[in-house]
UniProtKB/Swiss-Prot annotation:
This is Solute carrier family 25 member 44. Mitochondrial solute transporter which transports branched-chain amino acid (BCAA; valine, leucine and isoleucine) into mitochondria in brown adipose tissue (BAT). BAT is involved in BCAA catabolism and actively utilizes BCAA in the mitochondria for thermogenesis. The keyword tRNA processing does not apply. One of its GO terms (molecular function) is branched-chain amino acid transmembrane transporter activity. Solcar repeats lie at residues 18-100, 107-210, 220-302. It holds the Pfam family Mito_carr. It comes from the Eukaryota. The gene is SLC25A44.
Length: 314
């Protein structure tokens, strides 16, 4: 009898790399389009002082939609799409690191922990400059600014974000901070995303394994993998949200010290300030994680070398 708890993990050496990258870029773009509005909302909630403008995720969604229309929810999106590069670097580093660690440990938890942290280190080194620019674009609202910089608006004062205004933000960052400005908050990003990634993968495999005990033998593995993803994302989000709030403020407000930013946040808003944007983060993470997990597992299945297709149970 087959052990239903034996979830077969497709490793790097099992993949057709050409298929893996082509399908991967398409899948990542679809995910970005679907969850970007909540990424923007989370950023604004984390930066605003108290509840000066928005009273929560739903309130922010309605106000942005009324004020700026659907395009207001996609400010900075074109710039943000360049993170597709870091996304591919992330999965490549993750899979290669798992393969490397497998020579020293067969523990799936150890492989996931080390690979997740390493992948995030590589990805954040590419992502941070893109994030800095896109976050400043996210903070523009009808010609008003919530961050340090303000782009030029059109004659009607709508402040529509275009490539010219992206260049304007880049110019202002260079003038204010030089090239170092594009890596503002780099350490804070590493302190946010390395633990987030290192925690997510082990919890994902842990939840999937536990759910496999509860599911009938006939239940496809992809079902409890799809449930495990959001559970792992919620767990990681709760654990790392305080650092994510600090990271966002450092990058958008031009802070130079993580510790001083933390102290200021605590003085202004108390411990609850560290949980700002958590609901938006979980809301955006839940559907995206389901798509990522189902998509990533399906992507790996589609990218299997032909001779291995029949050897995998789903």
């Amino acid at each position: 009898m087959e052990d239903k708890r034996n979830i077969q993990i497709i490793e790097w050496e099992h993949l057709d790399k050409k298929k893996f990258y082509v399908f991967g870029v398409a899948m990542t773009m679809m995910i970005r389009v679907s969850v970007y509005p909540f990424t923007l909302i989370r950023t604004r909630l984390q930066v605003q002082k108290g509840k000066s403008l928005y009273h929560g995720t739903f309130d922010a969604f309605i106000k942005i939609l009324r004020a700026d229309g659907i395009t207001g929810l996609y400010r900075g999106f074109l710039v943000n799409t360049f993170t597709l590069i870091s996304g591919q670097c992330y999965v490549t580093t993750y899979e290669l690191t798992r393969k490397f660690v497998a020579d020293y440990s067969q523990s799936n938890t150890v492989k996931s922990l080390v690979a997740g942290g390493s992948a995030s280190l590589v990805a954040q080194s590419i992502t941070v400059p893109i994030d800095v620019v896109s976050q400043h674009l996210m903070m523009q609202r009808k010609g008003e600014k919530m961050g340090r910089f303000q782009v030029r608006g059109n004659p009607e004062g709508q402040g529509v974000v275009a490539f010219g205004q992206t260049k304007d933000i880049i110019r202002q960052i260079l003038q204010a901070d030089g090239l170092r400005g594009f890596y503002r908050g780099y350490v804070a990003s590493l302190l946010t995303y390395i633990p987030n990634s290192a925690v997510w993968w082990p919890f994902y495999h842990f939840y999937a394994e536990q759910l496999s005990y509860l599911c009938p033998k006939e239940c496809p593995h992809i079902v409890f993998q799809a449930v495990s993803g959001p559970l792992a994302a919620a767990t990681a989000s709760i654990l790392t949200n305080p650092m994510d709030v600090i990271r966002t403020r450092v990058q958008v407000e031009g802070k130079n010290s993580i510790i001083l930013t933390f102290r200021q946040l605590m003085a202004e808003e108390g411990p609850w300030g560290l949980m700002k944007g958590l609901s938006a983060r979980i809301i955006s993470a839940t559907p995206s994680t389901i798509v990522i997990v189902v998509g990533y597992e399906s992507l790996k299945k589609l990218s299997l070398r032909p001779e291995l297709v029949d050897s995998r149970h789903w």
